[in-house]
Structure formats: structure tokens, C-alpha cells
Amino acid sequence: MTFMNSIILYILVGAASGTLAGLLGLGGGVVIVPTLAYIFSQMGISHDHIMHLAIGTSLTTMVFTSFFSTLAHHKYKRVEWQVVKKFVPGIIIGSILGTFLSNQLETKSLTLIFAIYLILISIQMFIKSNSDLNKSTKKSKLKESYPILTLGGMGVGTLSGLLGVGGGTLTVPFLTLLRKKIHNAIGISAASGLFATLFGTISYIGFSLGTPNLPEGSFGFVYLPAVIVIALVSSIFAPLGSKLSGVLSAKVLMRVFSIILLFISIKLLVTYVT
């Protein structure tokens, strides 16, 4: 793959991840990680490091994406900071645990886990796209308490650190169980994702510094050229996604995206696992 081709792909994935972050509360890792895995494989990077490098790079780019998405949601008063504050301690613990586990796994195992995660999320999103998005807010009896939010944060943080995702696919459904309206859940998810990816990035770099046979421009398992382009583009598109979230049909978007995720997961399994 030529340098220009990789730059074009970085721009496209940055636009997609930024829009998704603002639109559905997703950090964009579900798009960034598989795309980077493909790009890195075409660059001739060691197969042993492809997924780790993709995950570490994804986490770093989403720090910027989540930051600008959070600012946009805060502007529209969709971020309940009292909830975020209770969420953060668990997220920090989970992020460190997740990145530690990720660094212990081989690329094949990580890819299999990531592909299964995408399949489960695609099914979840498709089912939810055919139901009332605020249904759980009416029926759930789960209370918004510090222990519940801490445990939820640990789950989100672990997932984020392990797979290089923002955790929105867990955070939004979890918050709707706490009777949060969908748009508020997305705003809280964006803010929580900022802390999950920030501490996940710090931990991932710490665990991977000194790893041999990484490409030039890497800082541990973070490939800086990709970070710069994707972060810049996604930061531009995140506010756009936030604006669109109040206009476009979330059900239709979730249905389409669930199908895309299913195809991506199958491609990952065929390419890197079989």
C-alpha cells in the first residue's frame, strides 16, 4: 500500500469515526480497529503486532474524538456530569485491566474476540432498531447508585482497553437501564468514553514501550502518523454527528450500521483467524 493510499483511508475512517461518535455515542473503534488492521497488514507490519497496534492507535485517536464529541454534547446540555463523575473511578480501573489483558493475548486471539464482539453488537443494534429506543427507561427498576455506576464503569473501561473501543456500545444500553433518555445516554457515553480512552491509551503505551519490530513512527503500540490524521479529521466530524443525532432517525442508522458491522466481523474472521 502506498503512503497516499493509507492517508486517504485514514481520512475516511476519521470522518466515519467522528460522525459515529457524535451521532450514536460510539467512540468509532468498531470502524477504526478493523480498518487499521487492514492497513497495517498491507504495510508489511509483523502479524504478531497488527491487532495490538490497531487497538493502541484506535484508543489514542478516540481521546481526541471523544473530547470534541463531549464538548458538542455539553453544548446541547446532554451530558449529566454528576453521572460521569460516579462512572469515572470504575472506568479507570477497567481501562488499566483491559489494556493489561490485551497485551497478554496474541493477534489471532484478539481478532477472534473483536470479531465476536462486533457480531454481538450488530445483533444488539439490529434488535434495538426495531424497538422503542427509550423503552428501558420506562420499565427498568435499576437504580442510579454509586456502586452500580462504578461496576458499570469497570465493564466499560475493561472493554475499551481490551479492544480499543470507546465503550459506547455498552454505556448507552446500560444508561438506558438507569432510565436515562437516549440522547442523554449518548452524551454521557461520549464523556465517559473520553476517560476510558485516555487512561486506556496511557496504560497501553506503558505496557508496550520497548516492543521490538514496530514500524517507524510508533510510540509503543501507537502509530503516530495514523493518530494525527484520524484524530484531526474525526475531531472535525464529531460535532457534525452531534447535530445530526437530533435530526436523523436513530433507528434507521442503527439498522444500517448493524449490517455493516456484521460484514466487517466476517471479513476479520476470514482474513486473520481462519
Per-region residue spans from a language model:
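Small-residue-rich alpha-helical segments with characteristic i,i+4
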Residues: L170, F174-F195
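Hydrophobic alpha-helical transmembrane segments that constitute the membrane-spanning cores
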Residues: G28, L198-S203
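Transmembrane helix-bundle signature of multi-pass membrane transporters/permeases
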Residues: G18, I55-M62, S189-T197, L261
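Juxtamembrane transmembrane-helix boundary motif
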Residues: M1-L24, V31-H52, S66-T158, T176-N184, ...
